[in-house]
Amino acid sequence: MTFNTETFMLKNQAAIQLYEEVKRQPIFDYHCHLDPKDIFEDRIFDNIVDLWLGGDHYKWRLMRANGISEAEITGPASNLEKFKAFARTLERAYGNPVYHWSAMELKNVFGVNEILTESNAEEIYHRLNHFLKEHKISPRRLIADSKVMFIGTTDYPLDTLKWHKKLAADESFKTVVAPTFRPDEAFIEHRHFVDFITKLGDITQKEITDFSTFIAAMEERIAYFAQNGCRASDISFTEIVFEQTDELELNDLFNKVCEGYIPNQSEISKWQTAVFMELCRLYKKYGFVTQVHFGALRNNHSTIFEKLGADVGVDSLGDQVALTVNMNRLLDSLVKKDSLPKMIWYNLNPAYNIAVANTLANFQANELGVRSYLQFGAGWWFADTKLGMISQMNALAEQGMLANFIGMLTDSRSFLSYQRHDYFRRILCTYLGEWIEEGEVPEDYQALGSMAKDIAYQNAVNYFKN
């Protein structure tokens, strides 16, 4: 069996037949970390390292595991030296998804069919750089070639959305680039919380003195995002908590933190519960899909974090006590307050997949006719792997309705990462194909093919309609 052919990751004849239904589907990439400024300015890339390795902490993490020096990863080494160091790593990375993604990117974007190794790295490096210039490879070119219809970026609540506005006004660019409201700094444990409150007051021209004035100012920013095409919010929590309190304590806590007080864990939980519930109320009011990423234990290597900052490859799976207790109480409280928006829950630790899918199934009732109003999101980050995807789909199929799943997202900072949608589609088709091959579902290719197409694209389109 050869590697990375037309039938790559398609393990049976049923999968091959199903893949014919999805391989030409467009991409609805509802969550990523691309910079809209880069999309608007559309500069032509002139070096493969900037495009392929720059900012990619998946690759950095792998290179560190292979003994590569930091100089050749994020430091002053030349681009050729960094490329060779990555090739030296990649040729030993069997079993890691980066090995598959890289092979797919090289072949499908650049036409490089060879396996990248240390011995051919320099020749391929120069060939790729020539390809970039000859074909004028730019962000918009990569987006168009991948048939990306929608991009959901991740945006600071006080952003002017200048670049989103420019893109929306550019009739030559057909892909919708929508902002996503990401209020990490609104939570008191964030190191920039006090600075955020000051800037929030300045931009909204409101005097923020307590919890209610804080929420009022946040609503003004949510309304601004809604006016500029926003369809979703996002937040990342280390743990899902539920600890209620009254507004008097929240006001006292707000003022103490603004004066330099360091909150304890119970106070952090109370603030997180109160703020998130208020935000959910507003997200429902403005029609935002609410994305919740949870379970990441971040910035664990303090020396690297202090030198390079966040999102550089030193994060881990987290664990927590009473996850389902807290999730159920939180969701039930939102229902009681008529504040439950459409939500996507992304669980990082696969050990909790069945528990999360089972909990979400308790709260699917809605009068809007929305299929799977609460979505169990695709495996993300460390679960963005073959086994991670299968684990997530297994849990969803057994505890909910896989046919309503909104499918894949890149969650990436790279313009080359759209190959992950194809990777997911191939794994999805093998997963469904095994059901057919093993007699677990009828051999109805029309029905299963339609299901695969829905998961690959159409379910997300429908779910994100305002």
From Swiss-Prot:
Q: What is its EC number?
A: 5.3.1.12
Q: Where are the transmembrane segments?
A: none
Annotated pathway, please? Carbohydrate metabolism; pentose and glucuronate interconversion
The record's Gene3D superfamilies line, in alphabetical order, gives:
Metal-dependent hydrolases, uronate isomerase, domain 2, chain A
Catalyses which reaction?
Answer: D-glucuronate = D-fructuronate; aldehydo-D-galacturonate = keto-D-tagaturonate
- What keywords tag this UniProt record? Isomerase
Pfam families membership:
UxaC
NCBIfam families assigned to the protein according to its UniProt record, in alphabetical order: PRK02925.1 (NF002794)
Family according to the record: Belongs to the metallo-dependent hydrolases superfamily. Uronate isomerase family.
The record ties this protein, via PANTHER family, to:
URONATE ISOMERASE
User: What protein name is recorded for this chain?
Assistant: Uronate isomerase
Which source organism does the UniProt entry give? Streptococcus agalactiae serotype III (strain NEM316)
Gene label? uxaC
